[in-house]
Amino acid sequence: MTFEMLYSKIHRATITDANLNYVGSITIDENLAKLAKLREGMKVEIVNINNGERFSTYVILGKKRGEICVNGAAARKVAIGDVVIILAYASMNEDEMNVHKPCIVLVNEKNEILEK
């Protein structure tokens, strides 16, 4: 049996852009994504602290420092300046669950790393 467990998260990231006309996804600063162990195409859940919206999408690696841009239809669920939590999960068996420690990255309002 496997269980869906928290794999990693970026906590309290600030939305820097929302692009309704781009094909879906969330663009995340490549350095920040790598630090959080997120890979291009990986499914993530976004929790908007400002309005309570929760939605799933996939990661695109961005080039701009601090970039967090929600694309496509999901852009309607955020506003520039909103604070979000970006979560990734992984399927694990009980042995994996017992040793796994999620990667948690805390950022400031400019999406600069405070703590990992």
UniProtKB/Swiss-Prot annotation:
The keyword Cytoplasm applies. Transmembrane segments: none annotated. Its cofactor is pyruvate. SUPFAM superfamilies: ADC-like (SSF50692). It catalyses: L-aspartate + H(+) = beta-alanine + CO2. Its main location: cytoplasm. The active site is at S25 (schiff-base intermediate with substrate), Y58 (proton donor). The modification Pyruvic acid (Ser) is found at S25. Substrate binds at T57, G72, A73, A74. Binds 1 pyruvoyl group covalently per subunit. One of its GO terms (biological process) is alanine biosynthetic process. Pathway: Cofactor biosynthesis; (R)-pantothenate biosynthesis; beta-alanine from L-aspartate: step 1/1. It is found in: Cytoplasm. Belongs to the PanD family. Catalyzes the pyruvoyl-dependent decarboxylation of aspartate to produce beta-alanine. PANTHER family: ASPARTATE 1-DECARBOXYLASE. This is Aspartate 1-decarboxylase. It comes from Helicobacter acinonychis (strain Sheeba). The lineage of its organism: Bacteria, Pseudomonadati, Campylobacterota, Epsilonproteobacteria, Campylobacterales.
